[in-house]
Amino acid sequence: EFEQVFELASRFTKRNEQELQLVLFTLLPLDDDYKDVLVQEEVMMTLSEAIQISLRRVDISVRFSSTQYLVVLIDTKQEYISVVTDRIMQSFYMMYRGKDFVLDYDIAKIRKNNSLE
């Protein structure tokens, strides 16, 4: 699924000459030995909900791994990226009241020439 989203995003940037922002949200257990997969899956569903209610209709999200979601922000100005990530983080922590996980994220940009920044 990730490959399809990335290919779509790459074609989009070439065709429309717009930049995309990639945000990779990662769920991190506070205890390195944490192994409750069912609880982790529930928390990932919570993250999915937080992302869905926080994105615009044109933006895309896809599950990247058992602990990660990739968000593709289409033609989002640099100064608004923190607004979106803050909204997702706030939504997540309002819904998730547990103490086993924290949420982190990394941002990359796909330029019009398809290079990553």
Walk through the language-model features, giving the residues of each:
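Sequence-level detector for tyrosine residue identity
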Residues: F12, Y34, Y69, Y80, ...
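Conserved long alpha-helical elements within nucleotide-processing catalytic cores of c-di-GMP signaling
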Residues: E1-S10, K14-L24, L28-Q52, V62-S65, ...
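Short, intrinsically disordered/low-complexity patches at protein termini
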Residues: L38-V39, T85-I88, M94-Y96, D104-D106
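A short glycine-enriched loop-to-beta-strand structural element that forms part of the catalytic core
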Residues: Q21, D59-I74, R97-E117
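Short catalytic/binding micro-motifs of nucleotide second-messenger systems
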Residues: F12, I53-V58, Q90-D100
